[in-house]
Design a protein with these regions (language model features):
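A donor-sugar binding/catalytic signature common to diverse glycosyltransferases
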Residues: 27-35, 183-211
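Acidic, amphipathic alpha-helical patches
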Residues: 48, 134, 185-186
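Active-site and donor-binding regions of nucleotide-sugar-utilizing enzymes
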Residues: 1-99
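Short, surface-exposed amphipathic charged segments that create phosphate/polyanion-binding patches used
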Residues: 16-23, 31, 97-107, 160-162, ...
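Phosphate- and divalent-cation-binding pockets in alpha/beta enzyme and binding domains
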Residues: 68-69, 130, 206
Length: 211
């Protein structure tokens, strides 16, 4: 099979693998569903909001999620047609990969970090000037402050405008504040930091994979 990655959730496929909150498995002859993230909301029964019964196979990342699935499996909408399997979390493969190590090295060189310790600010949603709170609280310390905003589409224009205004306010004003482009993989940003500040996103769970 030829493997294609796409942002178009309506793309027809022989085998479709989905991890979005909103999916369209009817466009695939055979469909596989994974969690969107490890911190997925609506626990313990996320399937009430994001049913799996329209998929052929479901994949959960570990024992915790297997137990959650088992507790809810009495409901028809929890059960994919061919079963649910505990197969791990795909992003964890990146943590020890040479590809990520190379990307992290390149990003460090690009940023030319000033200090040995780096604190990453990586929220899901930029609201209420929280980036400014982060910088004002920590900019006097001998640490690098890394800013990595999520790569939101223009549909969320209020959030993208908040991100834009925060960057205008801070970029170039501090010698220890470094901006990582929103398009950069969050895994690369996590690979070069020592501490993470985030909100309700999966970022914190993924940071734990780096030890």
């Amino acid at each position: 099979y030829k493997v294609t990655f796409t942002n178009d959730i309506f793309t027809p496929a022989e085998i479709g693998v989905y991890c979005q909150h909103v999916c369209h498995p009817e466009n695939s002859k055979f469909s596989v569903i994974l969690l969107h993230d490890l911190n997925q909301g609506h626990k313990p029964n996320i399937w009430e909001y994001e049913p799996w019964n329209k998929f052929d196979i479901g994949i959960v990342p570990g024992t915790f999620w297997t137990n959650l699935w088992s507790q809810c499996a009495c409901q028809y909408y929890v059960n994919p047609r061919c079963g649910t399997y505990e197969l791990g979390y795909p992003k964890s493969n990146l943590v020890s990969s040479s590809e990520l190590a190379q990307c992290a090295h390149a990003l460090r060189q690009k940023l030319n970090l000033k200090y040995d310790i780096s604190i990453l600010y990586a929220p899901s949603w930029e609201n209420d000037g929280k980036e400014d709170d982060f910088i004002q609280a920590l900019s006097s310390l001998k640490v690098n402050l890394l800013i990595k905003q999520a790569n939101w589409s223009d549909v969320y224009d209020n959030i993208t405008e908040n991100i834009h205004q925060m960057r205008l306010l801070h970029e170039g004003k501090y010698d220890n504040v470094f901006y990582i482009e929103p398009e950069e993989s969050i895994m690369t940003a996590l690979a070069i930091c020592d501490l993470v500040v985030s909100d309700e996103s999966n970022v914190m769970a993924e940071a734990l994979m780096f030890g």
